Amino acid sequence: ENSRYKFKENVSINQDANLQKNTEYSQVDFFQKFLFKLPYQNLLNLNIQYSESSDIDRYDKLTEEKDGELKFSEWYYGPQKRLLISPSLKFFSQQTLLKRGRVTFAYQKVNESRINRRFNSLIRSSQLEKVNVFSLNGDFDTSFNKGHAISYGIEGTLNNVKSNAYSQNIIINGNEVSDLGPKTNIPTRYPSDGSSYKSFAMYVNWTWNMNDFFTFNAGTRLTYTGLRASWKESASINAQLSNVKLNSSALTTTLSMTLRPSKKFQIMTVLSSGFRNPNIDDIGKIRENNGILVVPNTFLKPEYAYNLDFGINYKSINQLTYMSFRTFATVISRHIVRDDFIIFSDTTTPDKSTILYNGEEVTTIANKNLGNRFIHGFSIDGYSYLSKSFKFNGSISYVTGDENETYGPMPAISPIFGSISGEYTKNKIKISALYKFSGDKSPDDYSLGGEDGLEETPVLIESSGAVKYAGTPKWSDFSVYTNYDISEDVKLRVALTNIFDNHYRTFASGISAPGRSFQIGLYLKL
């Protein structure tokens, strides 16, 4: 019940455990596209988007506790404003090395903020970010005789981030916030003196359709990235932070083969490599969660991935049945993951592994390169028309990673999940029934760096009175959707979701999924 303008000193008890208070927000989105037809079938497209939200309360932070009491009275995102302007030119040519092409420029501006105030405190902290993103993409292709085709292109991006942070005392008049005190500098979320991330890449891809039974593909991409970040001396958590420059380049490749032994079957195998340079979020972010503070690490290096994929597709001659199986294995070199990090210049606490941050002693961790890791998994999906009007769909995915004895389980490995659905279509009406499900994940399989949000899972009280997190329980969700085409220009959509009103939370989420909901929508084409 506390907000930007409201103040309440005492805790309010939520009488309904299934009701997640302070989770509503509003957002306005504007979309407009202009299409200009040019001579010789060339097309110019202009895409303009603007969105703005209200304040958005962070439910998982508002329910966070310390020493048995709520930690925050306020924790919300301020209104996010996003502007996108993107012109794109699609053209055709009769040149030998250029038959078709598309050039796209994009500019995006994002303003966002994070505001919090601790319980029983009158000090409100604000972190504000202004992000400007520029990008230019050019994609071109041509084809030759004997089944040869070549595509090639370039990409350039530039991201500029300005970060500001301050605290203010709120001035109270009854239950109203009547004014704010002077601003005091506090640590920023991103480098306080500005940061930028740029990249330039070029690629070429060759496809050879040798015959109806065999296709070979080879591609390569050269990528250059550059990161710059600077910190001001004031309100810094680490006196050794000043400037960081990280320039990296990598040549990555892809080789694939597709075999079609019959009209029903297709067999594919792909061998590829990947590269990811640390971005501003990886190197320079400061973020506190449950007494753990992620701090900048200017010594972070790129990570590399080496992948092997294999797949089999089956499609019946009449195309009424389809089945796909995929499996993959990936080795990640110099894997970036969170680990303990000591700020040697800090003397605010006698423990080198902790510092004082916003008046609280917190343990410091940072992103580090921690050797090689291995991921593998599979997915199966397909459909079948049981009759002209009824279609059955199904899918399932499973991923697992190795468990390093020193660094623990890998982060962001979700439990097995899938879906089963049936669709009935007749004339202007379509009825769909969807069943989604997920397996569980043991707390022992959560990453040690906190990326997976173990503290957001259910709590178990042991016989000794100790509190233990249960991990992610398995869950399921059954929903029904109906679409009715009143006319070509008017369409009605009605849905009843989570019919059995199951209370569940998806993996790594800080908020539960919606309960039983009735939805109605109307599509009008003017």
Each predicted region: which residue ranges?
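Transmembrane beta-barrel wall of Gram-negative outer-membrane proteins
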Residues: 1-55, 81-83, 145, 210, ...
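Extracellular loop and loop/strand-boundary signature of outer-membrane beta-barrel proteins
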Residues: 15-20, 69-77, 88-90, 119-128, ...
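Repeated loop/turn-to-beta-strand initiation elements of outer-membrane beta-barrel proteins
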Residues: 41-44, 94-101, 111, 147-150, ...
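Outer-membrane beta-barrel signature, preferentially recognizing the C-terminal barrel domain
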Residues: 71-94, 191-197, 242-252, 256-260, ...
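Surface-exposed extracellular loop regions of Gram-negative outer-membrane beta-barrel proteins
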Residues: 109-113, 224-235, 245, 259, ...
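Signature of Gram-negative outer-membrane beta-barrel scaffolds
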Residues: 151-262, 277, 287-290
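Gram-negative outer-membrane beta-barrel transporters
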Residues: 211-212, 224-225, 328-331, 348-448, ...
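Outer-membrane beta-barrel "beta-signal"
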Residues: 256-258, 309-313, 514-526
